[in-house]
């Protein structure tokens, strides 16, 4: 993905909006297909009427990590257990939705 330049260099700036497939797989082998939307960050920053940027994306410095961002949570019930703590959904870290 093309990275932005200047002040937005920590974000992606693809020439056209992208809809990328992703797959989440749990330790129990359960999996879920998801979609990641990526759009031109600089263009989104220039639209001040938007308070949430659902297609904002950028690298976070580790190929083993991914930040889904706030839009992933819209319309979902998401449950989390803190690392080392036990709950009805297991010993953390656990993410369920």
Provide a role label for each language-model segment.
Residues 1-12, 69:
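Aspartyl protease active-site motif detector
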Residues 13-17:
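Short coil-to-beta strand junction motifs in C2/discoidin
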Residues 18-29:
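Short conserved beta-strand and strand-loop elements enriched in small hydrophobics
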Residues 29-97:
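Aspartic protease catalytic domain
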């Amino acid at each position: 993905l093309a990275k932005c330049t200047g002040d937005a260099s920590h974000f992606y700036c693809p020439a056209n909006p992208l809809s990328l497939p992703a797959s989440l797989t749990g330790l129990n082998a359960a999996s879920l297909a998801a979609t990641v939307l990526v759009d031109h960050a600089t263009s989104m920053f220039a639209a001040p009427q938007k308070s949430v940027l659902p297609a904002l994306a950028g690298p976070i410095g580790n190929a083993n990590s991914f930040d889904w961002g706030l839009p992933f949570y819209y319309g979902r019930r998401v449950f989390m257990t803190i690392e080392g703590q036990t709950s009805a959904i297991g010993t953390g870290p656990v993410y369920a939705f």
